[in-house]
Design a protein with these regions (language model features):
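N-terminal glycine-rich cofactor-binding segment that shapes the pocket for flavin-like pterin cofactors
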Residues: 1-472
Length: 472
């Protein structure tokens, strides 16, 4: 049953996690109540999925990297010591068992198109969409870690713009396989005539491009969504252009309302230029919330959590994300006096969050130590709800990807304290919509709709010969 929302804007929530220890909060795995070290146990993920569905989360957004953060001091040692997203397991295997214990929760799978050919990957997507009954999304990334490129035989990472040229063609192949290879009605399951599928309605895609040659048919029958919900997280100009053309949901990590408002407006403008509706794309900002029964209790939790942050682990993350070796600087060095383009770009972004702060290397590590680059909100459910509503109203963002400090504690506090407050205000759903993830998010049909480019690859079944003309 769907409950009517108030006239205020609905807030969307995803949980943000990764098949590793600590994810965005380096060092917090050592906290006595943290369970992230249990990432390799199915019970960890099953418990999380049940908790998130109880809290009516839209989905679980699962990050991934294929590589190690080895920029800090030119080595991966710090990342290894501090479990900074290593060890890390494959995210795909998590989805099916979590889908089995839930009915509505969506699953956003991060998978890099840099390291797997689209033909077998299309089969993985269809398989997951079948097994989840249409509750899967794909976060499209072009990998950025040099260590990942080297370990698959590339001497260096492909240059940025070429990666997006590659991505555009990769998506063409995916659309042709998932949308165009099998017509609606191709699967008959006709026991009397012993005909499972009509070959007249299944077509080779005959793709020949700059990067890929794929002549054959898709190996899977159409899944509930055909193409999973498409997420994208590119922050560059080219990445945002790619998102405007392909993504249905965009994940950003803006540390301030000023920067987020600019980013959201830019993405929506690009969506219009690509021929779409500016609000047809859902935009989620990275956010971490620490919620307590009172503001004082929440602040006490935050102070407790900060004692476990690993400075070395935070620098390993920051160095990997930015390409800057922060190990060459002292903790008290002021960033604005370090004259590199990459550092000045980082300073400019964080200065919008707190223009009066003296941004030293230590201050940047402290910021990123709980929840990564996104903003942190600490307080009672009422305080946090006020703040999240202000972000939505002032920036035009649709919702948040919530990172954790301590898991599952952070998410449990959101479910038990924050969600009821948001529901009371009429800005968060009381119940899920029925249907696939796409239907739950957008309230329309299960498949890509025009003018999305993927929809243009779908064949009109009415133009094809019927099975009666082919099979007797």
């Amino acid at each position: 049953m769907e409950i009517a929302m108030s006239s205020q804007r609905e807030i969307r929530l995803n949980a943000f996690d990764m098949n590793c220890v600590g994810h965005q909060s380096p060092g917090l795995w050592a906290h006595p109540r943290d369970r992230s070290w249990q990432y390799k146990d199915l019970e960890y993920w099953v418990d999380l999925a049940r908790l998130l569905e109880r809290g009516k989360f839209d989905g679980l957004f699962i990050a991934d990297v294929l590589g190690i953060y080895d920029v800090l001091n030119g080595s991966g040692d710090a990342a290894i010591r501090q479990a900074t997203q290593v060890p890390v397991n494959d995210p795909l295997a998590l989805i099916t068992p979590m889908a089995l214990v839930t009915e509505h929760l969506g699953f956003g799978l991060t998978a890099s198109l840099s390291f797997e050919h689209p033909y077998p990957f299309a089969r993985r997507l269809s398989t997951l969409d079948h097994l989840t009954k249409g509750r899967v999304g794909w976060n499209i990334v072009t990998s950025y870690l040099e260590s990942g490129a080297r370990n698959i035989g590339q001497q260096t990472q492909t240059d940025h713009d070429t990666r997006y040229d590659y991505a555009d063609e990769y998506l063409q192949v995916i659309y042709k396989l998932l949308e165009g290879s099998w017509e609606d009605g191709a699967v008959l399951r006709d026991r009397e005539r012993k005909i499972f599928s009509d070959p007249r309605k299944i077509h080779p895609i005959n793709h020949q491009g700059q990067f890929f040659s794929v002549p054959g048919i898709h190996l899977c029958e159409p899944s509930p969504q055909r193409t999973p919900v498409l997420y994208q997280a590119g922050a560059s100009s080219r990445g945002k252009q790619f998102a405007a053309g392909h993504a249905e949901c965009v994940f950003v990590a803006a540390p301030s309302k000023v920067l987020l408002k600019k980013t959201v407006a830019d993405i929506r403008r690009r969506a219009v230029e690509a021929g779409g509706d500016p609000h047809s794309i859902l935009i989620f900002n990275l956010q971490t919330v620490i919620v307590g029964d009172t503001d004082r209790e929440a602040q006490a939790k935050w102070q407790e959590y900060k004692q476990y942050v690993s400075y070395e682990g935070a620098l390993a993350l920051l160095s990997g994300w930015t390409g800057i070796d922060f190990g060459q600087y002292q903790p008290d060095q002021v960033l604005k006096y370090l004259h590199t383009n990459a550092i000045q770009s980082a300073v400019e972004a964080f200065s919008t969050a707190d223009p009066n702060r003296q941004w030293t290397v230590q201050a940047l590590a402290d910021w990123a130590g709980i929840g990564g680059f996104g903003p942190l909100v600490v307080g009672s459910a009422q305080t946090v709800a006020d703040e999240l509503q202000s972000w939505v109203e002032e920036t035009d963002v649709d919702g948040f990807n919530l990172a954790y400090a301590v898991t599952h504690e952070t998410f449990r506090d959101v479910v038990e304290l924050l969600v009821p407050e948001l529901q009371k205000r009429g800005v968060f759903k009381q119940e899920y919509r029925e249907g696939t993830l796409r239907e739950k998010l957008f309230g329309a049909g299960p498949r890509l709709a025009a003018p999305h480019p993927g929809a243009s690859y779908r064949r009109d079944a009415r133009t094809a010969a019927s099975v009666e003309e082919k099979v007797t």
